[in-house]
């Protein structure tokens, strides 16, 4: 995964109701993280660090790794709490970025969609497995592209943000391609109800992604040595279904 700052002009901390999301996800994560071989957690693609901070509050020692220096700057700008470390580095060779072994790892928020081919995904999983203790879980969450392609869905739900200049709209458009790649277009729009035009583009970029399917994900995990897996359709622990689930959530060991 190469460094990218496609999201440099979008503050994701304002786009997500983080306290509610973290509490909801912890209900799911508390089960696999309840009996880890070590309290050290690895946060792959940590972004602005919300998960890392939350896990540290729960008593874990967390190392967050990301390839975006902009995201890491934002993660550090309010100070780094005890028990948290943020590192810049390539997830494909995370064993060269972090020191020691970990009792568990997470890769959440559709981070793996930035990995563009099967061999590279397998390499990433091998690298992660090399820094995990025996029996340590790797928890993965990506969008369920099987459902998105099957349904023809092109847009994720809109997010409306109030800021000092009024109201903004976060628009995320997807174009699915036959080779499994996705052109993702995150855009931030300024809305002025009395304006002409009423909508103005603040920032908009095309980001190349890969829409990983369940079988592809499992094949890469198998090749990397993760032989035991649990699959869910959301972090509400509902069973995974190819054409119905919003997410693909995997607990791999």
Where would I find each of the regions flagged by the language model?
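SAM-dependent methyltransferase
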Residues: 142-216
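Conserved class I S-adenosyl-L-methionine
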Residues: 1-39
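Conserved beta-strand signature within the Rossmann-like core of class I S-adenosyl-L-methionine
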Residues: 135-142
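A short glycine-rich, Lys/Arg-flanked "PGG" loop and its adjoining helix->strand segment in the class I
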Residues: 122-134
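A short acidic, Gly/Pro-enriched loop at the edge of an enzyme's catalytic core
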Residues: 96-104
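C-terminal lobe and adjacent flexible extensions of AdoMet/dcAdoMet transferase-like proteins
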Residues: 208-253
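Class I SAM-dependent methyltransferase "Motif I" SAM/SAH-binding loop
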Residues: 45-49
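Class I SAM-dependent methyltransferase SAM/SAH-binding core
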Residues: 52-94
């Amino acid at each position: 995964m190469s460094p990218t700052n496609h999201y440099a002009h979008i503050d994701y901390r304002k786009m997500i109701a983080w306290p509610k999301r973290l509490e909801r996800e912890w209900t799911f994560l508390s089960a696999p993280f309840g009996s880890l071989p070590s309290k050290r957690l690895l946060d792959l693609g940590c972004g602005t660090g919300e998960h890392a901070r939350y896990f540290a509050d729960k008593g874990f020692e967390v190392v967050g790794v990301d390839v975006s220096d902009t995201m890491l700057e934002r993660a550090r700008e309010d100070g780094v709490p005890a028990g948290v470390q943020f590192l810049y580095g390539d997830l494909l060779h995370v064993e060269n970025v972090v020191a020691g072994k970990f009792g568990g790892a997470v890769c959440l928020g559709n981070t793996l969609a930035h990995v563009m081919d099967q061999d590279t995904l397998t390499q990433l999983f091998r690298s992660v497995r090399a820094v995990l203790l025996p029996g340590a879980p790797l928890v993965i969450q990506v969008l369920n592209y099987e459902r998105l392609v099957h349904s023809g869905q092109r847009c994720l739900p809109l997010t409306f943000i109030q800021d000092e200049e009024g109201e903004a709209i976060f628009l995320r458009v997807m174009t699915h391609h036959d080779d499994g790649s996705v052109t993702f277009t995150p855009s931030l729009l300024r809305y002025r109800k009395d304006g002409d035009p009423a909508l103005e583009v603040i920032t908009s970029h095309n980001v190349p992604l890969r829409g990983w399917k369940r079988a592809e994900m499992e094949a890469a995990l198998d090749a990397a040595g993760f032989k035991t897996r649990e699959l869910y359709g959301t972090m509400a622990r509902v069973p995974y279904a190819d054409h119905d689930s919003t997410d693909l959530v995997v607990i791999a060991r």
